[in-house]
Amino acid sequence: MLWPKLILAASLSGLNASDNAPTLAEAPSQPPVGRRVLIPTWELVVPVLSDSTPILEQNGPDSVVLMTEASESPRWLGTIRVVQLNAQSFASATQSYVDGYATSEKNKGHAFLVDSDRAIDGPLGTARAVWALSASPTSQLESLQDAMVGLIFVPFGEAACILGEFKLAAALGDAKQAECERLMLGCTGPTPESLAQERAQQLEEGGRVLEAAQGKLAEFAHTPRWYRHLLRRDDGSGQDFGVTVTWATYGPPPSSLATETGRLGLHVHQQTLTGLGTQDPYSEHFDGWVQDDMGFETFGLNWTKGESVWKSDGAASGLFERSSTNTEYILSAGDLKTAAKRHRVFNGLPSATLPMSLRMLTGKLLVDAEISEKQIRWYAPIMSSEDVALSARRDQVEAFEKGTRVTWTPRQGEPATVDEFDANGVLQRRVFPDGSEMVLTDYSSLVQAWRVAGLPTELLQEGKSRYVKP
């Protein structure tokens, strides 16, 4: 792709302040917008021009929406992103950016002649649109060697702005410029300040949910729960392709923590086999223990890719400890085939840190905390041979039939998973981002379903005899 070489780049750092005041103009009328792109970190919704091919390049706060005309010889392209004002006023920061951009273009031997500089009233405040003629003989797109460059700045809270950089073939004229301005004024989202406050409140709520369960983990113990993994056919029927079984017992800590604590806690076990009958079989085995007051946790996670069997070719582990002065999570993962290892230590964590062992029991946590309609956040481990992270998980909680439905994303920008819990907080159904489902059943019904589907029921029998001994 040509995008990396076509993105118009400049820097806000080290720019001189200048308060040149552009003339004020009325906002262009807003046309209906068909498509939009979300920049997840900022929860900013960006409209998309109708004749474009948009791409979102995610890089946390530096994420960029890229747009170009859907043509073999595009006549325009653009980028939209959020930039910090670096303690400058909106006027001085935008002028510094324009000056820096002009200098950069002239240093390349390109012309940069300002044609118009206007202030435009918009929903987020008074925006600024600068259009300049840019003659760029070195442009890789012949249609853009003689072009108009647009730098459009939209206020975004007290310390940031939304920056749109556009390059248009001069022949497109004023109509396309006005369309780009309308697009920028159509960007919507909470300000960074309100977003930070909202997320802090959601983390506080997540901490309250976990605190409500402290000293009550004996109530979380349960006998084996069996789940069918299903792919939905076109007619709505389900095709079995895997199983998950989980159970929990209450008792003393494992030997690895025997010298650290004598308190009781919850042992959580989970076995998963998926991908049966597909090209991507996968198995997973999890064992964890979390202390009753959630002051300690230890867990081990093993997985196998390419085979649906009760063994592993990858492994991960975690150790969590909360004291009066610090909250720490130590996470490690490795690939037993390649010997690749990852190890990370997280310190100073908030109270809203969800133990890995409770990831299948969040419904019970919400019931105990009497949460049925709310959005909460908590930090939760993400473990694989490719990734070791402690990310801010977001849960949208809502009442559903006789229980609760939770739509959650493991981290910002990733697709959501939907969990449905009954009134007691027991997981009844999980819908994964790919549309597959995990549905609560019983062992006898599961064996029968596998027989009908022609799946190897001996795997179920082996797993039950080897692991399911609560």
Language-model segment annotations:
Residues 325-391, 396:
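Beta-strand/loop-rich accessory regions of lumenal/periplasmic or secreted enzymes
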Residues 125-135, 162-164, 260-270:
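A short hydrophobic beta-strand element
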Residues 167-322, 367-470:
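Acidic, serine/threonine-rich low-complexity disordered tracts
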Residues 39-43, 71-77, 124, 159, ...:
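Glycine-centered tight beta-turn/hairpin loop motif at sheet-sheet or coil-to-beta transitions
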Residues 3-77, 108, 140-145, 155-160, ...:
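N-terminal targeting sequences that direct proteins away from the cytosol to non-cytosolic compartments
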Residues 98-154:
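Signature of long, low-cysteine stretches enriched in small and polar/charged residues
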Residues 65-99:
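A short acidic-to-branched-hydrophobic micro-motif
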Residues 93-97, 101, 176-183:
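Stable alpha-helical elements in mature extracytoplasmic
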